[in-house]
Structure formats: structure tokens, C-alpha cells
From Swiss-Prot:
One of its GO terms (cellular component) is plasma membrane. The keyword Membrane applies. It comes from Rickettsia conorii (strain ATCC VR-613 / Malish 7). This is Protein-export membrane protein SecG. Keywords: Cell membrane, Membrane, Protein transport, Translocation, Transmembrane, Transmembrane helix, Transport. It is found in: Cell membrane. PANTHER family: PROTEIN-EXPORT MEMBRANE PROTEIN SECG. The chain crosses the membrane at residues 1-21, 54-74. It is a multi-pass membrane protein. InterPro entries: SecG (IPR004692). Involved in protein export. Participates in an early event of protein translocation.
Length: 100
């Protein structure tokens, strides 16, 4: 479960980086790769709105996934601590000296 969520988390992070780099900035950044002029079927404003909405959605998914991963990780860690404590108790009981 954690492995799948971790893969999804990394995928969302990569997509988020790509979408942020494609957004129009003051210096036009990488957004000029898509043509840069308003002569196409889709206007620059429409593309900007799509990229803004995509950024918001990906950021929300990223944060939710991070919280779920942190929650699962803390539960897994507490389970590990309880198992270690059980092993230590069993070893302490088994290591008592035998009277002759």
C-alpha cells in the first residue's frame, strides 16, 4: 500500500513540476515552447486557466497523499516498536539462569 502511494506521490510531484514550469510568467519561461502566440485555436488565457486549475488540483492531491503517507508511516513505525518490545520481553524471560 505504501509503495503504491509513494509511486503516486512521485508521479504527482513530477507532473506538478512540469505544470508549474509551463505556466506563463513575467519572462514567459518555458510557456513559449507551446507556441507563444495567440494565433492558435486555444487562446493563451484558456491555457493559463487550465494550467492554474491543474496546479491547484495537483497540489491538493500532493498534500493529501503526503498526509496519508505520513499517517501510514507513523502507524507502521509504532507497530515496529511494539514488535521490538515484545521480542525484548521474550528474550528477557528466556535468559533467566537455570538453577542446578
Amino acid at each position: 500500500m505504501i509503495d503504491i502511494l509513494l509511486f503516486v506521490h512521485i508521479t504527482i510531484a513530477i507532473l506538478l513540476i512540469i505544470v508549474i514550469l509551463m505556466q506563463r510568467s513575467g519572462s514567459d519561461g518555458i510557456s513559449s515552447i507551446s507556441g507563444g502566440n495567440n494565433m492558435g485555436v486555444v487562446s493563451a488565457k484558456t491555457v493559463g486557466n487550465f494550467l492554474t486549475k491543474s496546479t491547484i488540483i495537483l497540489t491538493t492531491l500532493f498534500l493529501i497523499n503526503a498526509i496519508v503517507l505520513a499517517n501510514l508511516s507513523s502507524k507502521k513505525k509504532s507497530d515496529l516498536v511494539s514488535k521490538i518490545n515484545e521480542i525484548e520481553e521474550n528474550q528477557a524471560e528466556n535468559s533467566l539462569p537455570i538453577a542446578k
